[in-house]
Amino acid sequence: MAEDTETRPASAGAEEREEGEIADDGDGSSAAAAGRITAHPLENAWTFWFDNPQGKSRQVAWGSTIHPIHTFSTVEDFWGLYNNIHNPSKLNVGADFHCFKNKIEPKWEDPICANGGKWTISCGRGKSDTFWLHTLLAMIGEQFDFGDEICGAVVSVRQKQERVAIWTKNAANEAAQISIGKQWKEFLDYKDSIGFIVHEDAKRSDKGPKNRYTV
């Protein structure tokens, strides 16, 4: 998908935008220009979410700081969004970007996510940008054999590392989870082992849940 569409450069004001903020020229010119371009629709619509709990009280309920940024359903709209927000490596420690199929919230409590789990890749600080982009392209481009099992992806910036994760619907479907994990590693050319954690196991464990699957 990415090879068929030319990326657009970020706007000149990108460095001055706050995290999660989308550039807007205010005169409607971007929307007008988009209307003159033949759009390439995606199989699914996707919503970008941003979570920046920095400065919030630790008593605030988990998930209460997550808010949607933009929903896109074409290749052009994706690049228009991606080129006008910060890369993960530029986010504050503790912040997360989420990209989930439209109408699925990036929360364990969402009924579509409730019985699922996640594959996770960890990397050093400042190293997640490429992993995140390639994950998004594979996901919204429907490159996974079990793409219907995928809810979305998350990139998390933490003090000592950054993490990219793919959330799936049905943790009990071992064949689907193994396929997704293996294909994801291939798309990213990632050589180390990765583990799949079931959401229910994560909620019950205080010391860190064990991997249900490993590839």
UniProtKB/Swiss-Prot annotation:
Binding site for mRNA: 58-63, 90, 108-109, 158-163, 203-207
PTM info: According to the redox status, the Cys-113-Cys-151 disulfide bridge may have a role in regulating protein function by affecting its ability to bind capped mRNA.
Record PANTHER family: EUKARYOTIC TRANSLATION INITIATION FACTOR 4E RELATED, EUKARYOTIC TRANSLATION INITIATION FACTOR 4E1-RELATED
Keywords for the protein's UniProt record, in alphabetical order: Cytoplasm, Disulfide bond, Initiation factor, Nucleus, Protein biosynthesis, RNA-binding, Translation regulation
Keyword match Cytoplasm: yes
Function: Component of the protein complex eIF4F, which is involved in the recognition of the mRNA cap, ATP-dependent unwinding of 5'-terminal secondary structure and recruitment of mRNA to the ribosome. Recognizes and binds the 7-methylguanosine-containing mRNA cap during an early step in the initiation of protein synthesis and facilitates ribosome binding by inducing the unwinding of the mRNAs secondary structures.
Name this protein carries in UniProt: Eukaryotic translation initiation factor 4E-1
Record field: compositional bias (Acidic residues): 16-27
